[in-house]
Amino acid sequence: MSELILIPGETTLAQLEQVWRQGLAVRLADSARPGIAESAARIAAAANGEAPVYGVNTGFGKLASIKIAARDTATLQRNLILSHCCGVGEPVEPETVRLIMVLKLLSLGRGASGVRPEVIQLIEDMLARGVLPVIPSQGSVGASGDLAPLAHMAAAMLGEGRAVHEGREMSSAEALASAGLKPVVLAAKEGLALINGTQVSTAFALAGLFEAFASARAALVTSSLSTDAIMGSTAPFLDEIHTLRGHRGQIVAARTIRALMDGSEIRESHREGDSRVQDPYCIRCQPQVTGACIDLLWQAARTLEIESNAATDNPLVLVGADRIVSGGNFHAEPVAFAADQIALAIAEIGAISQRRIALMVDPALSHDLPPFLTPDPGLNSGLMIAEVTSAALMSENKHLATPCSTDSTPTSANQEDHVSMAAHGARRLKRMNANLAQILGIEALCASAGVEFRAPLATSAPLQAVIAALRQTVPALEQDRYLAPDLAESARLVREGVLVGAIPSHLLDEVRP
């Protein structure tokens, strides 16, 4: 297995996307090791001292005022992990579990959490040998960190709970043993350091972000195809228009669409003598809408890159100041806001895509395309209900885009009285991205058919390659057939990057985190 060396505080989203997509093993840079050891020494000293230090020699949450004897330190940390294993729901998918573990490594690697090097080593070894905890997906309110799901991660390190090794679920004790690893016995504060933090919410949000960027790239491709299918004008994509406004995403979106459509015979065929003065907004305003969505994704990416490198534990060991201080870095409000931004972008990319689908199937608006893109309308319904399905998915995503960060509820006997709801705010992005892939897949079906109806005129070379990639597994719709497999396959081609992969990569390189 390939290994990636990460520097806490300097890790990029590109590196984290590699981890998520490729399942790489991860090791912290050697430069992080001295700080980790030094903070652990400070915690060990505090555990043997008389002064109360939260989570080191006290209880937790509302029980923080109860002093714990030094002899009970290990029991305190083990009890914390086991009692907090209260997650419910479907297990988190393995690639996101791996990302959670890597984010926890990065947080602990900042040298402010007080865990011993052997705790770091076990997480690294579990990643390298493919031991992944089974983590239920529900149960976090996003403050004090993602306690319940991270407890399930930590439990696997103790040999408790369940884990997956070599594709098979088993007890964590068995998984560790089969990988040649031993459970860790936690020292002072280590249990708290493992479960306190925003790593689950952040991993959910990052997975959603990576998929949303992939969808944004696909949307620029499908929208370019749609523009040619309805013989739309490229004049609204002129660079001068967008530089006058100045938004980076808008400028990039317009430039990308122009490049994708460059050389289209269809476009050249109606530069003169076209009675239409302006195209509908779903064509003309693509850069303004999709570009604004890309800007939102970039903003969310910046927040999540900072959070991925953050120490989000409590209390934190301030080695330079020789202090151990309670704070609130575990509160995932920045992640909740980022998740809401991503959700809005996903919903809007899908909304304008659906309007282009509706445009193409409507003979009153499609500039001479046949009704519902079938060569024999009446006897055949063509893509009539595919458009209806896209409308259903669009509306569902609008509902799912309702902000989660505006919600809060007090927990833990009102000690933790304001929470972020970041975890489920970020978890919904998986469902939203799946819906968006379906919408864009339907647009690809419609736009490809529309362009094919313009023969013998051809679209641009890049867009011809996209249609060819689609037609390898989804034949043209000559007459009605059982369509569900076509929709599933077109969504897969979007989701797995096959359609975008047919295009020279430099044309879409700007649309990344």
UniProtKB/Swiss-Prot annotation:
Entries under Pfam families matching the protein: Lyase_aromatic
InterPro entries (UniProt xref): Aromatic_Lyase (IPR001106), Fumarase/histidase_N (IPR024083), HutH (IPR005921), L-Aspartase-like (IPR008948), Phe/His_NH3-lyase_AS (IPR022313)
The enzyme's E.C. designation: 4.3.1.3
Reaction equations catalysed: L-histidine = trans-urocanate + NH4(+)
Keywords attached to this entry: Cytoplasm, Histidine metabolism, Lyase
Entry keyword annotation includes Lyase: yes
Position of the 5-imidazolinone (Ala-Gly) cross-link: A143-G145
Compartments, record wording: Cytoplasm
GO MF entry, a single one: histidine ammonia-lyase activity
2,3-didehydroalanine (Ser) sites (modified residues): S144
Signal sequence extent: none
GO biological process, one term: L-histidine catabolic process to glutamate and formate
Protein name listed in UniProt: Histidine ammonia-lyase
Species of provenance: Paracoccus denitrificans (strain Pd 1222)
Gene that this sequence comes from: hutH
